[in-house]
Amino acid sequence: MFRILLADDEGIMLESLKHIIATSFGSECDIRCVKTGRAVVEMAESFHPDIAFVDIHMPGLSGIQAIQEIRKVNNEMIIIIITAYDKFAYAKEAVNLGVMEYLTKPISNKKVILDVCMKAMQRVEEARQKRSDDLKIRERLEIVVPMIESGFIYSMLQDRS
């Protein structure tokens, strides 16, 4: 299951994104929608999305400001900017904040959204797998280290005899 946050002050854009993702991925996704930068930050804290599609210009906090706040506590969320603004300064700031993609509106082909979404989902899966593998290694070390330590102590005692 992927938790996806959609943030845009344009209701039609939110509904379009939600429809594209929901019809393509169905029950694989839990999708939440917000319309302000502040709501992005609050939803990031309570919903813990894996992936966020964020517009830059929203009421209150901008998308960039919201991402800055989120990055203070969460560097793992995959963020995709979707905006009508293609100014270099915005793109540069987005890259500095670690966004995965910077898409400009209007997006005329839903395949672009689906490709970006699948790429983000793949990254989430890879991160989950890495976390799982790391935990397995730690669990094994918790078992092996005491065995090695006791074997070392035993061999030290044997050498002294």
Where in this protein do the model-derived segments appear?
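Active-site beta3 strand of CheY-like receiver
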Residues: 4, 47-53
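Active-site residues of response regulator receiver
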Residues: 8, 55
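Two-component/phosphorelay signaling modules centered on CheY-like receiver
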Residues: 11-32
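Helix N-cap/capping motif at the beta->alpha junctions
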Residues: 18, 33-43, 62-66
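Short hydrophobic/Thr-rich beta-strand motif most characteristic of the beta2 strand and flanking loop
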Residues: 25-35, 43, 91
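Receiver (REC) domain active-site loop signature in two-component systems and cognate sites
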Residues: 58
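Interdomain helical linkers/hinges and coiled-coil/dimerization scaffolds
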Residues: 95, 99-161
